[in-house]
Curated annotation (Swiss-Prot):
The keyword Transport applies. The chain crosses the membrane at residues 23-40, 88-109, 127-144, 195-212, 229-248, 288-311. Proton conductance is up-regulated by unsaturated long-chain fatty acids and inhibited by purine nucleotides ATP and ADP. The transport of chloride ions is partially inhibited by long-chain fatty acids. This is Mitochondrial uncoupling protein 4. One of its GO terms (cellular component) is neuronal cell body. It comes from the Eukaryota. The gene is SLC25A27. Solcar repeats lie at residues 21-115, 125-217, 226-317.
């Protein structure tokens, strides 16, 4: 064995396989954040489906009056009518999704920042580069994770279907994957991918770009160091911006992914994300695009804090340089 090979074997795993290590660390941090904040995500999804105007086209009272009003009453209604643990319905595919999504977006963003775009000599990273990098990272990560996101959204609505007397569509996560694949083929697993990546581009422009920009601004221009205080302040900002930018696209995405489909996998309510946008605004008003904003913001902010604090800490513990 040559000397370089022997030296490489002695290096820590994080140095031998840096991208794979960052992918796994991102997935671990995202799993912690998802488990902690998932009930807010479920509440948000239920709110976004309430009073859906396009359901009137299906007839037979398909569009029902909203059973709950507001975030708190929606959450309490789920607990009273379905049980406390139903607040985590769909969490398994959500974790699957974030292992792929967060791993993909974080590795992509860092690669673009360090290798493709590059920082200036004074370690400054221009905002326009960060915006493009954040959007590209979101698109790539979300496209890879679309099948798991589709299953998550549909499973989150199963409890509501049961209360409405409708048959359940899935027995579990793996049955959901198998059924969607059988009914719509590979294409069916990527239903709603266009609004999904549109949302991911906006959310990551808010999350990754804001966190990276605020953090490095604080480190380079204030007495604050690269520590938990800086990470916390940066993540608070990123959670707010991500919610403002991402909620309208999230409403469109959720509706397209949850709509009934024909045998060819085509949606019965919306032809495209643009069609869904137009129907929502015309039938329910502009503010329908911000249905679920409060739980989205209340979820995104703690999610962002838990994720970034966990991610920075486990990078430090694993011997990986700070983000």
């Amino acid at each position: 064995m040559s000397v370089p090979e022997e030296e490489e074997r002695l290096l820590p795993l994080t140095q031998r396989w840096p991208r794979a290590s960052k992918f796994l660390l991102s997935g671990c941090a995202a799993t912690v954040a998802e488990l902690a904040t998932f009930p807010l995500d479920l509440t948000k999804t239920r709110l976004q489906m309430q009073g859906e105007a396009a359901l009137a086209r299906l007839g037979d009272g398909a569009r029902e009056s909203a059973p709950y009003r507001g975030m708190v009453r929606t959450a309490l209604g789920i607990i009273e009518e379905e049980g406390f643990l139903k607040l985590w319905q769909g969490v398994t595919p959500a974790i699957y999704r974030h292992v792929v999504y967060s791993g993909g977006r974080m590795v992509t963003y860092e690669h673009l920042r360090e290798v493709v775009f590059g920082k200036s000599e004074d370690e400054h990273y221009p905002l326009w580069k960060s915006v493009i990098g954040g959007m590209m990272a979101g698109v790539i990560g979300q496209f890879l994770a679309n099948p798991t996101d589709l299953v998550k959204v549909q499973m989150q609505m199963e409890g509501k279907r049961k209360l409405e007397g409708k048959p359940l569509r899935f027995r579990g996560v793996h049955h959901a994957f198998a059924k969607i694949l059988a009914e719509g083929g590979i294409r069916g697993l990527w239903a709603g991918w266009v609004p999904n990546i549109q949302r991911a581009a906006l959310v990551n422009m808010g999350d990754l770009t804001t966190y990276d920009t605020v953090k490095h601004y604080l480190v380079l221009n204030t007495p604050l160091e690269d520590n938990i205080m800086t990470h916390g302040l940066s993540s608070l900002c990123s959670g707010l911006v991500a919610s403002i930018l991402g909620t309208p696209a999230d409403v469109i995405k959720s509706r397209i992914m949850n709509q009934p489909r024909d045998k060819q996998g085509r949606g019965l309510l919306y032809k495209s994300s643009t069609d869904c946008l137009i129907q929502a605004v015309q039938g329910e008003g502009f503010m329908s695009l911000y249905k679920g904003f409060l739980p989205s913001w209340l979820r995104m902010t703690p999610w962002s804090m838990v994720f970034w604090l966990t991610y920075e800490k486990i990078r430090e513990m694993s011997g990986v340089s700070p983000f």
